[in-house]
């Protein structure tokens, strides 16, 4: 069908126009109309937009925009020439690799495995970066400014980086090989293999490091004596720390014996102050009745073990450990100096965009959602300690704004207050998910082990005491 006739047909189409039945059915199938309708040129163009457009050849593009076409073609050939030069250089370097039997982690045989490993680390880094930005309130919130977040096309940065590292590694090895060949040409014969010298001529082994300086160790008896004294002192201190002496506490077997011995002690103390002989005689008569207790106490067959019970117990010497106390104090000082800026930070300034990421489609926050389920183990410890610090401050005091900032951030502040109200709807569930088992004594005591990367053995093993009990609905 000719385009001119088709255009004329579309302009003069009317329902009263007589047309053959086969043509009418054909148009009805194409246009999906039960009956012929009025069609215009704009409707026809709109229908044609559903199909793929025709790609013009390069000759047509050269006539339409010659400057752009010329720049694209020149860029294409430059890239191609650059790629050919790099490929030639790579082939030469690979030949040298095969001759010298070098190995690289970025070689072609192992590139796929290391590429997957780097991609996995990159993915974890992005997740860690996003989650750490939620915790760190002092940094900028614009996560899109990082190259990884700008667009999906920038995902190729990692692959390009691997190629650059590989090219740099190959180029350096090629340059080192050239330098080694030049040095061999000046000093030795090129056709002489130096790796055969060590096992063909054993005399060369002693002449390998002729000009190397040798240090003769000097024996100092005083240093040996000091080291021996230090080891002895360390062993003594270790024995004293490991020795848990029990405290002996004697308890009378019966209350009657305890009362009788108490009366004897009171009478003996009173007799030292009495000067009247009659009173002394009367007291001595009363004491004779209970003197048999002393005989029983000092008899071998009965003695102290029969009249009393030993209720000794071992007391842990946790708080007597000077190393433990020193580590606790240094950890708290580091903690205070490191997070002083975070304590002074206003929580209403830059937390809107972070909370917005955890909103659902209905603008509500799920009650069963916990940040600890998506954080890394190290970041979980940071979240717990930061929450323990922020919980000490009143939100109403932090919500005081200036008049200028209140007018600018009125909408965002209202939204944050509404979100906080949604969080506090179910108090029992929030206590279960955040207070326990998040805040425990071993987390605050062992934060130097996870946060400051310092270890103190198993000294905190006895401090695992839960501050909060189990809470049931």
UniProtKB/Swiss-Prot annotation:
One of its GO terms (biological process) is protein transport. It is found in: Plastid, Chloroplast. It comes from the Eukaryota. Its main location: plastid. The keyword Thylakoid does not apply. Keywords: Chloroplast, Plastid, Protein transport, Transport. The keyword Membrane does not apply. One of its GO terms (cellular component) is chloroplast. Involved in protein precursor import into chloroplasts. May be part of an intermediate translocation complex acting as a protein-conducting channel at the inner envelope. Belongs to the TIC214 family. Part of the Tic complex. This is Putative protein TIC 214 C-terminal part.
